[in-house]
């Protein structure tokens, strides 16, 4: 069974984290909210109780998801144990995903070299490696990135698809195409 860790640091962006958790769980994909602390407060003062506390080892997961928000993304970037786990995932060919400002953690881990990525407008100025593309969701190998709060659903559906879930069924059931794809 596929397992996903959504990392929660103080000041995470609630829409980005909880949308991913909700959509993955609707797809029956095991998804844990892994906090740097048991109780984590988002950037808009919403408190979330983590499913587990990060103790430096995520090897039992198949994907790590990094939500954005500030100062949450900076906390992700500055946590050396997490940076090591991101590097381990890269070496093992496991999936990594980041949205909004969180690609700064991927950059800190040295994982954006020769990769295409996207992020929240302006954050690319902090990322010296990689090739910024202004798209809703960018997939480059086993690395997936997205832009911000309004792209969280598209990001989550892409992750479901990558993990073998029924993304199209979820889009239909959640009325995504009716609302966001009327003219397509």
Predicted regions and their residues:
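Extended, subdomain-level signal for the structured scaffold at the beginning of enzyme domains
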Residues: 1-92, 96, 105-108, 113-114, ...
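Anionic-ligand binding patches
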Residues: 117
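Short, acidic/turn-prone active-site loops that include or flank metal/cofactor-
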Residues: 121-125
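Short aromatic-centered micro-motifs
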Residues: 137
């Amino acid at each position: 069974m596929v397992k996903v860790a959504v990392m929660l640091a103080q000041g995470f962006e609630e829409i980005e984290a909880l949308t991913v958790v909700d959509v993955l769980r609707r797809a029956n994909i095991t998804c844990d909210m892994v906090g740097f602390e048991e109780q984590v407060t988002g950037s808009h003062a919403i408190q979330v109780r983590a499913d587990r506390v990060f103790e430096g080892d995520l090897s039992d997961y198949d994907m790590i998801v990094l939500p954005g928000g500030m100062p949450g993304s900076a906390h992700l970037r500055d946590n050396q144990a997490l940076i090591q786990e991101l590097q381990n995932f890269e070496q093992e060919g496991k999936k990594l995903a980041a949205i909004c400002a969180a690609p700064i953690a991927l950059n800190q881990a040295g994982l954006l070299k020769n990769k295409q990525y996207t992020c929240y407008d302006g954050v690319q100025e902090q990322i010296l490696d990689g090739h910024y593309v202004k798209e809703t969701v960018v997939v480059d190998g086993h690395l997936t990135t997205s832009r911000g709060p309004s792209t969280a659903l598209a990001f989550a559906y892409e992750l479901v698809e990558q993990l073998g879930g029924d993304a199209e069924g979820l889009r239909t059931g959640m009325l995504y195409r009716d609302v966001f794809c009327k003219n397509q």
